[in-house]
Structure formats: C-alpha cells, structure tokens
Amino acid sequence: IGGCLKKGLSRGRWTLFGDFSMQAIYAEGVSGTKLIEKLDDITSFIRFKLTVNCRNTKPICKEIETVTGFKAPHDLWTKVDGPPVQYLTWSTMESQCKKLKAVLKQLADSHIEPGKITILSPRKREDSVVSMLDGYVVKDFSVSPGMNTTFCTIQAYKGLENSVIILADIEGFSAEKLMYVGLSRACTGLYVLESDSAKREYDNLLMRRLFNE
C-alpha cells in the first residue's frame, strides 16, 4: 500500500478500514492487535471503532455465531430481520450440482436479478461444482458490476458483498476465519451447500451454541 500512496504510509494521507480479527485469513498465528502494532511501527494514526453491523440480517448473524463461535455483543448486530439461512446437504459432486441448479432456479422464479447472486467456494473454479453447471451463465467476479451471476473464491471475495450468496463445495467448518468471511458476504439471502460430513460437523456446532445460550 505504501508504494501506491504519495509520501507512503508514514507521511501520506490515507483511511484504512479493516477487520483485523475474523477476516485476517492470511495472518495465521498473528493477532489483530499485533497487526495494528505493525502499522503503529510505521506511522501514527487516529483510530475509530465501527460498532454496528449494517450488512447482515439477524439470521445470518446467528449462523456466523453458530459456525465460527464468534459472539459479538447483541447490540452490535443488525436489527434487520430476513429469511432463514438454507443448508442443502450433498453426498456427491453430481448431487451438489443438482442442488445448486435448484437454488438458482428458485431464485430466478423469485425474480432475483442474476447480478445480485454470487457463488463462493473455497476451491478454484476448475475444482468447484460451478465447473459442472450447464444452462446457466456464471461469470468470474470482476469489480465492474454486471448483469450475470458471478463466481469467486471465498478468499478473493473478502471485503465484498452481494444480496444473495451461495456457499458451495463446503466439506467442513473448521476453517473458522474462512467461514466467517464466506457467511458474512451475504446481505439478505444465504445458501450453504454442505457435504454429509460437513452436515454432521454443523449439527455439533449447533448443539454447542444451544448449550451455551
């Protein structure tokens, strides 16, 4: 960043927004505090804490809590209600493809614009169920807004959002930060295509949350 900024980070003018805890997916073993301290070593700056989640609906926030264990004070979560998060379980890539097509058809029947739908996966496109889709136009995500449904890896979509997110190729929930990023990209509708083993893992996570309430 410093190389792109006139006078660099130390002397230039900049504003940085960041989630240095749950979305620091490339900083394994380094805490959010340590990341900010690294910036402190370069320059001085004013800190301002954002305290309200303006993106996700209450059901999505609840699923984030269930899957990742991340529990923010409830007054910081959004007050906006929305549809429940939908989980669809698959046993083979073929069955996952059928379920993905069913979701896309359901959204089309509900008159959801294709451009408001993004499919996210922990896998690259060639290894994802998206590569098996036929009869649907799914473009690779680009910054320029388009009219088509888009695909992107969860990692590359960090910091972005869309009205409807479909998480595909989910075979487990142990990568908590990655799952946090994926789940929290959705503004309104969230669908999760999970494997049989991921379903069992999710059931255990749900029990953990219920016992802790």
Give the positions of each predicted feature.
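Conserved helicase motor core of SF1/SF2 NTP-dependent helicases
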Residues: 1-213
